[in-house]
Design a protein with these regions (language model features):
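Short linear elements at protein peripheries
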Residues: 43-99
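Flavin (primarily FAD) cofactor-binding/catalytic cores of flavoenzymes
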Residues: 100-103, 112
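Flavin (primarily FAD) binding-site architecture
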Residues: 148-164, 316
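Short beta-strand segments that buttress and anchor functional surface loops
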Residues: 82-83, 130-134
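A conserved short coil-to-beta-strand element within the FAD-binding core of flavoproteins
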Residues: 110-129
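C-terminal catalytic lobe of FAD-dependent flavoproteins
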Residues: 67, 77, 84, 90-92, ...
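Dinucleotide-binding Rossmann-like beta1-alpha1 core, especially the glycine-rich loop
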Residues: 1-68, 199
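Core beta-strand elements of the Rossmann-like FAD/NAD(P) dinucleotide-binding domain
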Residues: 136-145, 149
Length: 344
């Protein structure tokens, strides 16, 4: 958490067009599993890890303000905590990072499919020979180092590389989000499903082409996924689960404008108990595993897991792992201070 709070502070400073602080509300009801004292202790810890700065402080929302909380159910409501966290459009942030890298000299091959990589036989001199397909044409290129950052496809990509590196056992966890009609004026709400007490967030959402937040983003679910990541899609049961949670706290039956699903990569726990309930995924540590083909002179690194907030810190760790294999060059920029602009 400390790392994510540090990286959040950098993003707020370097990418104000893309990342902004939002008030988060945690309502606590008589039947809530997490009691007020426990949440308060957690928020104190959160504030201390963030240096007790203005952006990590929290408060109890006075009873007289409850009526302003976007129609939040007040029956049985005991207290409401408010704290701050950052919100971004993940696709826009990713495009901004890509554009920044390109401006600094990176070559991007989008809409391409990795086919295979062979070599290098001599770790000191040879290069990887890479084959890829772009616009129905096969191409080749060479590389001193391969970083496999293929997310849920990481082990599929690794299997196409001529290497002795072993794959890391992972679980793929599907998360579905719904885009709902409506507006949330006050901020983001941390809700707990009445069915299994899993966290679900309801937040203001800006649709593509619109100047301000005009919808609600609701999510997410956690469903074990097997199969081809390319065909992941929202399940009817997931949509029902999310709508049920929203109605429990806001009464109205929302109109679903859109739904989408993605996959998280979780390294397998030591206890591979197949009967564990799905809501235990929420409690699992979302660690990032960096697997190399050798310790001393790595030429291949695969990334498993990770969080968007810490993408820059993860990249620094990747470079540290690969430093013995990289040429001795002066950096062209410092990502701790490099501005990120919203892509046009």
């Amino acid at each position: 958490m400390r790392e994510c709070l540090h990286e959040r502070a950098l993003l707020l400073k370097n990418a104000p067009e893309l990342v902004r602080l939002q008030p988060f509300f945690i309502p606590v009801y008589k039947d809530s599993v997490r009691r007020p004292w426990l949440l308060r202790a957690g928020l104190i810890f959160y504030s201390l890890l963030g240096g007790a700065g203005q952006d990590t402080r929290f408060r109890r929302v006075p009873h007289c303000e409850w009526a302003t909380l976007d129609g939040l159910k007040t029956t049985g409501l005991q207290t409401v905590f408010q704290y701050q966290d950052a919100q971004t459009d993940d696709a826009a942030l990713t495009r901004a990072v890509m554009a920044s890298a390109q401006a600094l000299g990176a070559q991007l091959k989008t809409q391409s499919t990795f086919i295979a990589a062979s070599g290098p036989e001599n770790r000191q001199k040879d290069h990887w020979q890479i084959r890829y397909r772009q616009h129905e044409q096969e191409h080749t290129c060479t590389a001193n180092i391969i970083v496999n950052a293929a997310g849920p496809w990481a082990n599929d990509v690794l299997a196409r590389i001529a290497t002795t590196a072993k794959p890391v056992a992972v679980e793929l966890v599907q998360g579905t989000h719904l885009v709902l009609d409506g507006k949330l004026e006050q901020g983001i709400y941390y809700l707990q499903s009445p069915r299994d007490q899993r966290p679900v967030f309801a937040m203001p959402w800006q649709l593509t082409g619109e100047a301000e937040a005009s919808a609600i983003l609701l999510g997410t679910t956690e469903t074990r996924f097997t199969g081809n990541p390319a065909v992941v899609h929202p399940l009817p049961a997931e949509q029902e689960y999310l709508v049920e949670t929203y109605r429990y706290y806001f009464s109205a039956t929302p109109k679903i404008r859109a739904a989408f699903a993605g996959l998280r990569v979780l390294p397998m726990p030591d206890d591979k108990n197949e009967n564990k309930s799905e809501n235990q995924y929420a409690a699992r540590q979302r660690e990032t595993v960096l697997q190399t083909d050798c310790a001393n002179l790595p030429r291949l690194l695969t990334i498993y897991g990770g969080k968007l907030t810490a993408y820059r810190a993860t990249a620094e760790k990747v470079l540290q792992k690969l430093q013995n294999s990289l040429p001795d060059k002066a950096p062209v920029a410092d990502t701790r201070t490099l501005p990120l602009k919203r892509p046009v």
